[in-house]
């Protein structure tokens, strides 16, 4: 198989290393204070309102992995693998080989140590590598909460990077290939009007805060953009599954946990970082509550 569309204007795309590390390499110990024990850092899935965050994160991973029709011995690529919970879940419960890509040095070290504890003969690999640099055949692809970084790049092409992404992985998967893409989305103009959404100054200030203090360079796609670039590469969207309402209790649980560990957080990272992250988590909960943002799981098939 060959990779097509992995250049823009004749230049190899570069992963947004500095932008990603500015957030995810804060400190593993800091994130452990407020994420669930699996350290899953994306929207959970509360099948029942009485679920714990850990149970809801398990449900989210299962929801995503079940959509991939995994079979024992397949190779699953996890793009933006975070602290490895999805890879560990896939090895343990689906008996597959896994390759995880991260740009975070802290996540890489955590995942390497985690794999040493996993009792399975399957291949378990984590790399410090961007999707832009990956070029090996795989059977299935999962990406949970990483697509939001795929258009930031290193000053090149913006949303056109999606074209490269979808074409590359279309060509690296078999004829029955499947991809599960879980990403935050924003409404298009028509949906925003239907929802009665406005753009008050407080919203604009919060967006600026997020792009400055939390996720520099991050960009949120519209569903129509995922449709356009994925279909242009040959993918078909088998299912759109919108689960953004679940991010309200997820973010609230994170904020409550961080607040409960305030003294430890300040000892680790200082008062300013604690205040910034509390503002981030509470403010994002409001965005999902008011439907300025959503989460969609796209099941992509060939």
Swiss-Prot record:
E.C. code: 2.1.1.79
Single Gene Ontology MF annotation: cyclopropane-fatty-acyl-phospholipid synthase activity
Pfam families per the UniProt record, alphabetical: CMAS
Summary of the knockout phenotype: Inactivation of cmaA2 causes accumulation of unsaturated derivatives of both the methoxy- and ketomycolates. The mycolic acids of the cmaA2 mutant lack trans-cyclopropane rings but are otherwise intact with respect to cyclopropane and methyl branch content. Deletion of cmaA2 has no effect on bacterial loads during mouse infection but causes hypervirulence due to an excessive immune activation which produces more-severe granulomatous pathology than wild-type, and increases both the macrophage activation and the macrophage inflammatory response.
S-adenosyl-L-methionine recorded as keyword: yes
Enzyme class, UniProt record, top EC level: transferase
Subcellular location: Cytoplasm
Residues that coordinate or bind S-adenosyl-L-methionine: 41-42, 76-84, 102-107, 131-132
Pathway note: Lipid metabolism; mycolic acid biosynthesis
GO CC, one annotated term: cytosol
List of residues that carry N-acetylthreonine: 2
Keyword field contains Lipid metabolism: yes
Family: Belongs to the CFA/CMAS family.
Subunit structure: Homodimer.
Protein name: Cyclopropane mycolic acid synthase 2
Organism classification: Bacteria, Bacillati, Actinomycetota, Actinomycetes, Mycobacteriales
Gene designation: cmaA2
């Amino acid at each position: 198989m060959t990779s097509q569309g992995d250049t823009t204007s004749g230049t190899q795309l570069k992963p947004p290393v500095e932008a990603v590390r500015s957030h995810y390499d804060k400190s593993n110990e800091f994130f452990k204070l407020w994420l669930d024990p699996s350290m899953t850092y994306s929207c959970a899935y509360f099948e029942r309102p009485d679920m714990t965050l850990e149970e809801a994160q398990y449900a989210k991973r299962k929801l995503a992995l079940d959509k991939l029709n995994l079979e024992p011995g397949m190779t699953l690529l996890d793009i933006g693998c975070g602290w490895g919970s999805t890879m560990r879940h896939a090895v343990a419960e689906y008996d597959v080989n896994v390759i995880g890509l991260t740009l975070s040095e802290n996540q890489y070290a955590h995942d390497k140590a985690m794999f040493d504890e996993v009792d399975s003969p399957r291949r378990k690999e984590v790399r410090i590598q961007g999707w832009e640099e990956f070029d090996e055949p795989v059977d299935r692809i999962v990406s949970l909460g990483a697509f939001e970084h795929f258009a930031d790049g290193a000053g090149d092409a913006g949303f056109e990077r999606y074209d490269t992404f979808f074409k590359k992985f279309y060509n690296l998967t078999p004829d029955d290939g499947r991809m599960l893409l879980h990403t935050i989305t924003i409404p298009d103009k028509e949906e925003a009007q239907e929802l009665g959404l406005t753009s008050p100054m407080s919203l604009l200030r919060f967006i600026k805060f997020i792009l400055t203090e939390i996720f520099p360079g991050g960009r949120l796609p519209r569903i129509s953009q995922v449709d356009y670039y994925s279909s242009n590469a040959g993918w078909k969207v088998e299912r759109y599954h919108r689960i953004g309402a679940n991010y309200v209790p997820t973010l609230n649980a994170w904020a409550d946990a961080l607040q409960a560990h305030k003294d430890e957080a300040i000892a680790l990272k200082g008062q300013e970082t604690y205040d910034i992250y509390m503002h981030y988590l509470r403010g994002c909960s409001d965005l999902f509550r008011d439907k300025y943002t959503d989460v969609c799981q796209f099941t992509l098939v060939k």
